């Protein structure tokens, strides 16, 4: 995960994001390249909010948006340089009943995790999880907020390879750097947000 977010993003496709008994396969992501990317939270430098984005890689960066939704990112790139990959959609794999309970508005299982806020609701990911190490035992955490998280969020590799030719296009829901084709997805997967 030490590579650029544009390299790490498609590599994350088909990895599994899990929390307790709930898990989903990552089917859509977006890359954000720190100081080089006007759409990145870290574009203007280090702040208390963006500190986790500066590394080391493999940690979870969770932020609150629109005053109501959490969004989850995987920190990547060299330690000390801000970069992250937004997880945009998951294909539900395990704990689907619990996901349905957390997302009662979802009419179909493909609606449970087909957006960044939806997947955070389905897996109960909040700001308390920001700073959690996605790859290590639960004790390894960065930042103060993660200390309150009871069940760690983790990244799993079940042996499913990333797609050879992922879908690729511009990022969604941003107003700057809109021309960059840094959104990647598993082509044909019905859980992709759009």
Kindly label every feature range from the protein language model.
Residues 1-194:
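Conserved, well-structured core segments that form or line functional sites
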């Amino acid at each position: 995960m030490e590579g650029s977010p544009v390299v790490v993003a498609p590599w994350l496709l088909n990895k599994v994001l899990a929390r307790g008994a709930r898990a989903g396969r990552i089917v859509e992501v977006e890359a954000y390249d720190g100081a080089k990317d006007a759409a990145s939270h870290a574009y203007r430098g280090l702040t208390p909010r963006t500190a986790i984005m500066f590394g080391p890689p493999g940690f979870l960066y969770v932020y609150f948006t629109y005053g109501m939704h959490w969004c989850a990112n995987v920190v990547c790139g060299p330690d000390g340089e801000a970069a992250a990959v937004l997880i945009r959609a998951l294909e539900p794999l395990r704990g689907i009943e619990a996901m349905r309970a957390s997302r009662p508005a979802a009419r179909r299982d493909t609606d449970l995790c087909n957006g960044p806020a939806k997947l955070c609701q389905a897996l109960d990911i909040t700001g308390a999880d920001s700073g959690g190490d996605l790859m290590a035992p639960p004790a390894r955490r960065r930042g103060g907020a993660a200390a309150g998280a009871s069940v760690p969020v983790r990244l799993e590799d079940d042996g499913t390879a990333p797609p050879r030719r992922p879908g690729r296009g511009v990022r969604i829901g941003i107003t700057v750097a809109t021309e960059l084709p840094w959104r990647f997805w598993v082509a044909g997967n019905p859980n992709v947000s759009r």
